[in-house]
Each structure stands twice: as C-alpha cells, then as structure tokens.
Amino acid sequence: MSRIAETFAYLRAAGRTALMPYLMTGYPERDSALELAPALEAAGADLFELGVPFSDPLADGATIQRASERALANGIRLEHCIETVAGLRKRGVRAPIVPMGYYNPFLQYGLERLARDMADAGADGLIIPDLPPEEAHECHAACRAHGLDLIFFVAPTTPDERIDRIAALASGFIYCVALTGVTGARRELWSGLPAFLERVRRRTSLPLVVGFGISSAAHVREAGRYAAGAIVASALINVIEQAPPGEYVARAVDFVRSLRG
C-alpha cells in the first residue's frame, strides 16, 4: 500500500477530512518550502501538493501564476523541486508529497528519469494537469515502475466515459475540480459539487479530493461531507504573499490551523 493510500485509510478510520496544502517550490524564497512544510504538517496538514514553476501555467489563476513567476525569478527548475522533496524528508516530513507540474518540463527531463529521481527523493506521486489520459501511458508506466501514484483531474464538464478512462489509469486519489475555469479562492463552493462528486464516486473507488476554490474551514467541512479531502492552494498562497516580511511561515501556520475549524 502506498503512503497516499495509507494516509487516506488512516484518515477515513479517524473520520477526518484530508487537508492538502499547495506550496510552490521556491516561493516566496528559494528554500521556503523547507520551512513551510514541516510547520504546516505540525499544524494539521495531511498531504502536500508541491508546485513546479512553469512559464505558462494554463490551469492556474493569477495568484499561483504570480508565485510561479517569482519562483522562476528565484532560479527554480525541476531539479530543485526534486531536491526540495529530498530536503523535506531529511527534515522529518512524513506526509505524502505530490509534486504538481506541467508536462513539457517533465517530458524534457525524461519520464523514466523523472519517476526514478522523484521516487528516490521521497515523492509519492505526480499531478500533471495538462496530461490527458489518452497520452499518459508512458508516464503511467514510469510512475508504476517506481511506485509513484499518478493523479488525474476530473471536472464538472468531464463526460462519464472519460472519467472511466481516467479511473482505469489513476492511483492515489482523483483530483476533483470544484468549479470550471482556473484556480483561485472563492467565497462559496459550487452548488453542483455534491452531484458531481456522486457521479465520479459511481465510477471509481479511489479517494476523491476537491480542489480549486477552497479557502475556509467551512469549505473544508463541506468538501469533507462528500469527498475524502480538500486541497487549499490559492488561498494559502495569498496568505503567504500578503504576510509582512519574515512572518509568512507563522501566518501560513495560523491559516492552516484555521482550516481545521
């Protein structure tokens, strides 16, 4: 059983919704993730999504685009993300770590090499938002060979037959997009979320994790009524971005604690 599967099994038995913060590698400073992740794990984070900066992040809204631009300006590349995963394990982070990046840099690095190096560093899976299931077989094989889960997105607009194709390839969990459009914090979750998640649930036994728009404890509780977990991304990056100099770790910790209600 993978570390991701073990985490969801434990949380399900405990009756707790998985909380998965998103951190951008190299944001706001080059090694900030090495400070943030251990502190957020102690504050209640159960898994981590670790962003790999990219110059054209199509699925991301303005907040994460700014974070990506700053990380690139800090000199961050894919290799540094792999080093960051290894550094987090050396610092004692036990939660699953799932790097999220766009396909082109991964392909240029080499999919087999990427899966090997990520696994050796201590990563647990990959999220690739622009990799369709029809083109994922090489990446899927590389991940499977090295014990990594490959996580796919499903959206409210995803047809049932495509969900079936995704479910046949996916492992770890299914990333369920809680709205149409790009990432970004929202005041309220989409009213059609329960029906959407039920439609996905009928087609897979994998845990469902809700992302896009999660920004409050109420959102986490609502997502937890219908899904196994919630990803908080733009709202957390906003907190880090708006923190006074030198206070971003403390502000992020307070925010993650608040999400637990």
UniProtKB/Swiss-Prot annotation:
What is this enzyme's class at the first EC digit? lyase
Under CDD domains, the record lists: Tryptophan_synthase_alpha
The biological pathway it contributes to is: Amino-acid biosynthesis; L-tryptophan biosynthesis; L-tryptophan from chorismate: step 5/5
| Active-site residues (renumbered) | E49 (proton acceptor), D60 (proton acceptor)
Q: Which UniProt keywords apply?
A: Amino-acid biosynthesis, Aromatic amino acid biosynthesis, Lyase, Tryptophan biosynthesis
Catalyses: (1S,2R)-1-C-(indol-3-yl)glycerol 3-phosphate + L-serine = D-glyceraldehyde 3-phosphate + L-tryptophan + H2O
Biological role stated in the UniProt entry: The alpha subunit is responsible for the aldol cleavage of indoleglycerol phosphate to indole and glyceraldehyde 3-phosphate.
The UniProt family comment states: Belongs to the TrpA family.
What is the protein's given name? Tryptophan synthase alpha chain
User: What organism does the record attribute this protein to?
Assistant: Roseiflexus sp. (strain RS-1)
Q: What gene, per UniProt, encodes this protein?
A: trpA
